[in-house]
Amino acid sequence: MNESQPKLKYKRILLKFSGEALMGKSQFGIDPSVLDSLARDIAELIHMGVEVGLVLGGGNLFRGKALSQAGVGRVTGDHMGMLATVMNALALRDALERIDLPARIMSAIPMLGVVDPYHRRKAITHLRNGQVVIFAAGTGNPFFTTDTAACLRAIEIGADIVLKATKVDGVYSADPLKNSDAKRYDYLTYKEVLTKGLEVMDSTAICLCQDQGMPLQVFDMAAPKALKRIVTGERVGTIVGANHDQ
């Protein structure tokens, strides 16, 4: 790393980006400008020496809840959602490669000829070689969210932290768009998230991070230079860890 570069607090991160965020201001699909902006932010991290893994949701292309109400089975719906995350991963890989940033997609569901199958040791090698690794198809199993997949992959690859990009600047006691008295938290413990019922991630993801001591940081992706500020140690959004001194 160049001496002029700021000192890094986090050398390897797992970024969780929701499918809905990829829509931008649209109601469905992928906004190319959002992809390009995300790709530029990731490129900045790579040039700083940060190793970046990503997990994308699929809610911009597929909404399992609506199909479930129409009678489609949960397992079928979850498998369809996994395929949606692969489509988002392909779009992001293309955006990264357009700016000459090497990227690999590793899918929990084998799709030879389209993406690579997930392999932990190969993923770590790619990260060490400066490639962005996009983990697709969730965990490969129904009944598990992409949030849980993000935490699982972060633990497997030895990431320093899970960064969850959202549309608000952290975790609140209530929906800040509906309740002006909602309180924003700077720090939370895993236990506080679970006992307060805060919508940070689903309980399976939180418990997994708690068991393995994996910290989380929830932040507003639209905040200027958010990712760069986080990896250099600035407090952006809400940090979730074992204690308030995380």
Swiss-Prot record:
Binding site residues for UMP: G58, D78, T139, G140, N141, P142, F143, F144, T145, T146
Keyword Repeat: no
Entry-linked Gene3D superfamilies: Acetylglutamate kinase-like
Keyword line: ATP-binding, Cytoplasm, Kinase, Nucleotide-binding, Pyrimidine biosynthesis, Transferase
Residues where ATP binds: K16, F17, S18, G19, G59, R63, T166, Y172, D175
Listed pathway(s): Pyrimidine metabolism; CTP biosynthesis via de novo pathway; UDP from UMP (UMPK route): step 1/1
Catalytic activity annotation: UMP + ATP = UDP + ADP
Entry's EC annotation: 2.7.4.22
Reported function: Catalyzes the reversible phosphorylation of UMP to UDP.
The name this protein goes by in its record: Uridylate kinase
